Amino acid sequence: MRNIKIEKAVQRPIEQNEIEVVERKGIGHPDSISDGIAEAVSRVLSQTYKEKAGHVLHHNTDEVQITAGESDPKFGGGQIIKPIQILLTGRAANEFTLPSGETKKIGVDTIAIEAAKKFLQDTIINLDVEYGTVVECKIGQGSADLRDVFQRPNTIPSSNDTSFGVGYAPFSQTENLVLKTEELLNSKDFKKQYPFVGEDIKVMGLREKEDITLTIAAAFVSKYVDDVDAYLNMKDELKNIVNDLAAKETDLSVKTLINTADDETKKDESGYYLTVTGTSAEMGDDGSVGRGNRANGLITPNRPMSMEATSGKNPINHVGKIYNLLSNEITREVVSDVEGVKSIDMIILSQIGKPIDQPRTATAHIQTEEGYSINDVEEDVTRIINKWLENITDIKEFMLEGKLRTF
């Protein structure tokens, strides 16, 4: 029997709070770039390990540090003066043993650097990766006891730590709007139509009773902005686009503010949020893994959260990754499939050395719809939790295929 517990939630629904704060750091924010690189390196290493060794070997690449460069954005152009410095650290197996006893080497540094550069090329479209970045790899090899767990690929892995993951569903209107705003502004179709908007977009949502204020910091790409008037017109256009989205996504009142640090008395570039590449990493904003969005893509101080970084951790036995992703999948399925469940949040706690499908506890807190009790939904919720735990190694395949969000 697994340690699954279903309880009635004691906190009131998020919608009944007068104040709600929700944040998302867009894909071009330096912290998100760090997360994305870490996860890209882990995914490519995992695929390489599986191809060469037959299974994923030990690694954790969740230590990426970005040190900002220096740039000189100008209306209609600009230049990079000093490249962005990117340091890849962590641990990864650099060899494996064949059944014959022969040892084969794996070029971890080369693989990691190539994965990082490809992520940057695919994500920050105005960044010349070769000219504008310096990527250095200092990934070492893990200890023998950690590597040994990965030599038993057909067993349920043992938990690498005593840690926990959390998840909840459904999103509130504010959470949904914040997430969809950033996703729209960073979508490929949007970038084709509005290339002046860079990828470094931070959306902060504040709900005060029935009123939402979205404060958006959006890096504009200087070569697409001719002068101050063009910048201000583009900012108004962006505001209208966000307001149109908000009208479709929520019935609450929404006020949109963009680049509120701008000084509109200035007639040159110094008063406005301009970048050469579309990310503030080019000129003064550093980044680190785990300092931004949680595994569901948001930062939500009104909700249960884990401080664990999910990006870059191995998908085999690192419960700091697996349990956060698992909690998100479980809660979404429960809300979608179990009649009578209004909302759910849950926590899954591991115990170091124990099988990851046997957590110390998997506890769900449920708010039921009117007319339903915990007894009415307990069996179905337990069944879903048990199903996901029973098939917990599927998370590995989802991660290798890039199907799950980690930031």
Curated annotation (Swiss-Prot):
Q: One GO MF term, please? A: ATP binding
Q: Which Pfam families match?
A: AdoMet_Synthase (PF01941)
InterPro entries linked: AdoMet_synthase_2_family, AdoMet_synthase_3, S-AdoMet_synthetase_arc
List positions binding ATP: G140, Q141, G142, S143, A144, D145
Source organism superkingdom: Archaea
- Hey, which pathway is this one from? Amino-acid biosynthesis; S-adenosyl-L-methionine biosynthesis; S-adenosyl-L-methionine from L-methionine: step 1/1
Q: Which reaction does it catalyse?
A: L-methionine + ATP + H2O = S-adenosyl-L-methionine + phosphate + diphosphate
Q: Does the keyword Transcription regulation apply?
A: no
Alphabetical keyword list? ATP-binding, Magnesium, Nucleotide-binding, One-carbon metabolism, Transferase
Which Gene3D superfamilies does UniProt cross-reference here? 3.30.300.10, S-adenosylmethionine synthetase, C-terminal domain
Q: What is its EC number?
A: 2.5.1.6
Q: What cofactor does its activity depend on?
A: Mg(2+)
The main enzyme category here is: transferase
Instruction: Tell me, in a sentence or two, what this protein's role is.
Output: Catalyzes the formation of S-adenosylmethionine from methionine and ATP.
* The family this protein is said to belong to: Belongs to the AdoMet synthase 2 family.
Q: What is this protein called?
A: S-adenosylmethionine synthase
Write down the species.
Answer: Methanosphaera stadtmanae (strain ATCC 43021 / DSM 3091 / JCM 11832 / MCB-3)
Q: What is the lineage of its organism?
A: Archaea, Methanobacteriati, Methanobacteriota, Methanomada group, Methanobacteria
